[in-house]
């Protein structure tokens, strides 16, 4: 049910930041020396200043001003989409009139967000009509961005790619994909990179939850959230360690608060007292990075008091005897020395988790973004195995991921060490996916520098700087990286800012593809002491459509897959990411191979692009390892139309058929989560 405003909306005052860009900041550039760059904290100020060179939109308007006056009398269309601000997967109904996204409502029947918005999700519409959209392709010329045509951009970029491939090999190009791409675009980008002849590709997961994926996979098979946000309502105890869900994943707290109403005991372990900690029954302040001593301290009390699930361990866990030996070394005094946590608090946490089963453990960036993040994650998993909580409703490890499709991009997207669905890079994996893609294995192999490089992991987003700056004998490929694509990713959240700037300046080509002019574009434009370090470098900005200007599927943190409907047409000269991939592949000479088993449909301006539905079916045909095989676009759309049929605790369909397709959804779990 839509809560519809009957009267017209009032005028909106321009934001202060927008006004400042149009005023004083717009006069501050075009150049900035190194000293000023450092004084203004490098990246943050640089973004705002360099943004004055870029194409920014002011306010969304109807194409026909006269039509805008009569817009309220026009037909309103409701499009169902999914919020892009975190991994909960909140469904949103977008109301479109006269081609403009005029209003939004949370989907009250959604079993994931239960009809709720958070402050971030409530501003979702701004992605369609925000002030800072990149309007048209641009190229950096003499320190300033100048407008160019799409034809010029694609021609020059593809020519440079082919030149670099001929002179330095395909591994001289590195592609950073995006956890904002939908599943279809993520899989297509991995295919695109493979057909160019390299494994040099990555995305945001590398610097957020790659430690989770590896740590959890090495503990019990696959690296993903074991249960669901909803299932936490069945937990009798929950320990948040390294997660501030109240601010990072606000809607997820609804499920925790429902659990607390049912008597769930909530523990928060964090160096900071957060908004999540404010809701806890027990708050424990540990020293940053001391997660493992704390978790082993809990296990020490669990083993000492015989609280471990002995039958579960005997039947289902291997190696717990080795864990006991290590845990025995972590006596309460050593734990307190390492963590700063008194024994009584550690004992209380252990007792709460042991006496209130099933109990769950929740973590996020606080555990993963450490040099030993993989080991921290495994320690959390071991705790749950000792308590016998894994594989049980209300238990497990509920791992809150960040972006709306970081799980899906990890599952099927541009990973440097695997093909879609974690197939690895061995010959058999390549032959499997070549058959799925409808291309000859020998042809794909011929695109690589060698079979050895074809089966070797590529450069990661956390080390691309080294791939550019280090001596060639210190990197594991024939050539240094000479060109980088930032395709929906801005690296300004990473460390080593000055080295990053040096790496950008050393590149032969830098391509930024994004709906917004990001910090990457701003850093690339900054001169060093008033001089252009590499005047021969080519820098391009290409306007991509947002995820609300295309359709496709996204995978929430609990692995439920949801289908987004296209809300509005791509604004200005922006194009969908999969259209850009296809058009670039055409220029590079493998356009036919890229879409060999895909259906082409008219997109913006009647230009052809791969159909998202056919891309998902290709994923279904190939992803047997993780069971991404039954999530057909038709069935996902049926789930989105019939959210009211799914239980808000179990996510299982209580019974009913989809009126449009006749599918019997009885027994389906919402979004058909794998495995």
What residues fall within each predicted segment?
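Non-catalytic alpha/beta scaffold blocks inside enzyme catalytic domains
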Residues: 210-382, 386-392, 400-621, 625
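Intrinsically disordered, low-complexity serine/threonine-rich segments
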Residues: 20-23, 27, 55, 362, ...
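Long, low-complexity segments enriched in small/aliphatic residues
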Residues: 409-410, 415, 609-675
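N-terminal export/assembly segments and adjacent metallocofactor-ligating motifs
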Residues: 2-307, 319, 329, 334, ...
């Amino acid at each position: 049910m839509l809560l519809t405003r009957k009267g017209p909306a009032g005028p909106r005052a321009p934001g202060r930041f927008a006004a400042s860009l149009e005023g004083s900041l717009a006069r501050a550039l075009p150049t900035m020396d190194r000293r000023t760059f450092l004084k203004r904290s490098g990246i943050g100020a640089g973004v705002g200043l360099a943004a004055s060179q870029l194409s920014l939109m002011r306010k969304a308007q109807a194409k026909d001003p006269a039509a805008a006056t009569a817009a309220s009398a026009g037909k309103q269309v409701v499009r169902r989409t999914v919020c892009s601000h975190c991994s909960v997967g909140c469904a949103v109904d977008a109301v479109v009139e006269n081609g403009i996204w005029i209003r939004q409502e949370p989907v009250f029947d959604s079993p994931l967000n239960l009809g709720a918005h958070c402050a971030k999700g409530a501003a979702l519409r701004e992605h369609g009509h925000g002030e800072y959209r990149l309007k048209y392709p641009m190229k950096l010329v003499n320190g300033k961005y100048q407008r160019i045509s799409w034809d010029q951009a694609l021609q020059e970029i593809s020519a440079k790619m082919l030149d670099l491939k001929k002179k330095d090999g395909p591994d001289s190009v590195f592609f950073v994909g995006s956890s904002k791409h939908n599943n279809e675009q993520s899989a297509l980008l991995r295919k695109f990179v493979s057909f160019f002849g390299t494994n040099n590709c990555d995305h945001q997961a590398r610097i957020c939850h790659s430690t989770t994926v590896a740590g959890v996979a090495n503990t019990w098979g696959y690296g993903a959230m074991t249960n669901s946000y909803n299932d936490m309502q069945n937990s009798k105890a929950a320990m948040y360690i390294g997660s501030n869900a109240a601010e990072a994943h606000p809607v997820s707290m609804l499920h925790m608060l429902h659990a607390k109403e049912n008597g769930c005991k909530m523990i928060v372990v964090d160096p900071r007292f957060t908004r999540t900690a404010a809701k806890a029954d027990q708050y424990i302040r540990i020293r940053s990075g001391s997660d493992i001593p704390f978790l082993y301290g809990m296990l020490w009390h669990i083993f000492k008091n015989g609280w471990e699930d002995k039958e579960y361990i005997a039947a289902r866990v291997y190696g717990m005897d080795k864990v006991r030996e290590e845990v025995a070394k972590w006596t309460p005094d050593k734990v307190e020395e390492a963590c700063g946590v008194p024994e009584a608090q550690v004992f209380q946490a252990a007792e709460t988790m042991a006496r209130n089963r099933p109990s769950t453990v929740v973590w996020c960036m606080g555990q993963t973004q450490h040099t030993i993040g993989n080991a921290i994650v495994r320690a959390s998993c071991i705790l749950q195995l000792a308590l016998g909580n894994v594989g049980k409703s209300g238990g497990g490890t509920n791992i809150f991921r960040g972006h709306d499709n970081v799980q899906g991009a990890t599952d099927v997207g541009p990973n440097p060490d695997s093909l879609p669905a974690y197939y690895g890079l061995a010959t058999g994996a390549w032959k499997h996916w070549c058959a799925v893609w409808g291309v000859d294995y020998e042809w794909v192999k011929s695109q690589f520098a060698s079979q050895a490089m074809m089966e070797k992991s590529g450069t990661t987003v956390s080390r691309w700087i080294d791939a550019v700056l280090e001596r060639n004998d210190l990197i594991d490929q024939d050539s240094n990286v000479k060109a980088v694509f930032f395709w929906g990713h801005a690296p300004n959240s990473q460390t080593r800012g000055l080295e990053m700037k040096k790496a950008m300046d050393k590149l032969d080509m830098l391509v930024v593809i994004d709906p917004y002019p990001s910090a990457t574009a701003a850093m690339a434009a900054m001169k060093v002491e008033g001089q252009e370090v590499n005047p021969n470098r080519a820098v391009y900005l290409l306007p991509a459509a947002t995820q609300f200007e295309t359709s496709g599927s996204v995978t929430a943190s609990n692995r439920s897959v949801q289908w987004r409907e296209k809300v509005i047409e791509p604004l200005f000269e922006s194009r969908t990411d999969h259209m850009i991939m296809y058009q670039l592949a055409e220029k590079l000479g493998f356009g036919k191979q890229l879409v060999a088993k895909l259906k082409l449909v008219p997109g913006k301006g009647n230009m052809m692009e791969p159909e998202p539905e056919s891309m998902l079916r290709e994923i279904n045909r190939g992803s047997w390892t993780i069971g991404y095989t039954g999530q057909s676009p038709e069935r996902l759309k049926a789930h989105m139309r019939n959210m009211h049929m799914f239980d808000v605790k179990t996510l299982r369909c209580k019974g009913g058929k989809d009126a449009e397709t006749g599918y019997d959804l009885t027994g389906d779990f919402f979004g058909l989560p794998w495995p």
